[in-house]
A protein has these predicted regions:
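N-terminal accessory/interface modules of nucleic-acid-binding and processing proteins
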Residues: 1-284, 349-352
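Generic structural signal for well-ordered, non-membrane alpha-helices
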Residues: 190, 258, 296-299, 315
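Amphipathic alpha-helical repeat scaffolds
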Residues: 285-289, 302, 318
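Charged, low-complexity interaction regions
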Residues: 290-296, 305-315, 325-332
Length: 352
């Protein structure tokens, strides 16, 4: 997939051409929450009805399913750790070039590489086939409990003057004029994605922050089997009459993805529920986790970030560091054992 960059930009523009198209893209992101927007767009282009994708060995060895010889794989992108070369000009103490020859040396770097994956619909179950893990959606109570733990907020009963459930950030209070648990959970998720969007984009205009937050909430609600009651309100104003360029659309989808995934990770952790690893994070674990030394692995990830210009890969490495930092030594040992036992493969989802 030599022209994957152009393909992604074309698909991003099509997926954000108007509010209706954006909603469909958000649904696709919610259906494949472990995939980055890059891979969601590529998957939707090749196999729009896919439900769970995994590698050949994941299906045949772990899930004990058969893949027919003539089945056609989907081609996605995976992070690949390799060796590149950095070039530097020799300088004196005043940083003036003193040599016209650059000094080259090898350095560990990270980039994208194509990978062949297959949807579960292309496999044939055998006797003793393993079930594919689902996304473990949080319950409505889990969402509210996790949100209150994260925000350390109060709950207040208010008169019905506007929204039936709303997180008041200024008062740090979940204001309720209803007992409908679904609406309360939705208010909690909207409050959390707004908090995460503002944290990610502190110097950005409020319209864009609001758009990222409402779209991230839409994805997060769908992941947890809650039908959003709110529409996407900010897109038309942000998009304008003439629209944006494809790079801006792809950046928007990335910001939505990063905001929703961090909110989900923090919410699951606060609610005492298993944390899931994204596809890019699993690929990095497979390549880098050669021991159960958490600090060593995190240092490797931080070093990799210095040697890539791909924002999605930078985020994947940073997010993996953040998740590892949540776990105690026993949990890290379990991840390492799973990796050694080939349980961490290019699976549809890895949860611990």
């Amino acid at each position: 997939m030599a022209d994957w960059k152009e393909t992604l930009l074309t698909e991003a523009a099509a997926g954000c051409k108007n509010t209706a198209a954006l909603k469909e893209t958000l649904k696709a992101m919610a259906a494949h929450p472990s995939l980055s927007p890059d891979n969601v767009l590529l998957l939707r282009m090749q196999m729009p009805n896919a439900t769970a994708v995994g590698g050949y060995k994941a299906w045949t060895e772990w899930y004990r399913r058969t893949l027919p010889r003539d089945v056609k794989p989907v081609v996605l992108l995976k992070p690949t750790v390799g060796v590149g070369k950095d070039a530097y000009i020799t300088e004196d103490a005043e940083q003036n070039a003193v040599s016209n020859k650059s000094v080259e040396f090898a350095t560990t770097c990270i980039g994208y590489a194509p990978v062949h994956l297959y949807d579960i619909s292309q496999t044939i179950p055998d006797d003793g086939s393993e079930d594919v893990k689902d996304q473990y959606p949080l319950t409505l109570d889990d969402i509210v409990t996790g949100f209150r733990s994260l925000m350390d907020c109060d709950i207040a009963t208010v008169s019905e003057t506007g929204k039936l459930a709303y997180y008041n950030a200024e008062k740090n209070t979940l204001e309720l004029a209803t007992e409908n648990k679904s609406l309360i959970a939705e208010a909690a998720i909207c409050g959390l994605t707004r908090f995460e969007a503002e944290r990610r984009l502190p110097d950005t205009n409020k319209l864009y922050v609001g758009l990222v937050a409402e779209c991230a909430a839409n994805v997060l609600l769908r992941i947890n089997a809650i039908e959003p009651s709110n529409d996407i309100l900010f897109f038309a104003a942000w998009n304008g009459a003439e629209g944006k360029n494809p790079e801006q659309y792809l950046e928007l989808l990335n910001q939505i993805y990063w905001t929703s995934r961090r909110a989900m990770t923090r919410l699951r952790y606060a609610a005492n529920q298993p944390v899931s690893f994204d596809f890019d994070e699993v690929c990095l674990l497979n390549q880098l986790m050669t021991s159960n030394n958490k600090e060593r692995l995190m240092e490797q990830l931080r070093e990799l970030v210095k040697h890539t210009e791909v924002p999605v890969l930078i985020e994947a490495a940073n997010n993996l560091c953040e998740k590892l930092d949540m776990f105690d030594d026993a949990k890290v040992r379990q991840i390492y054992e799973d990796r050694c036992n080939r349980k961490i493969l290019t699976q549809p989802i890895y949860i611990i």
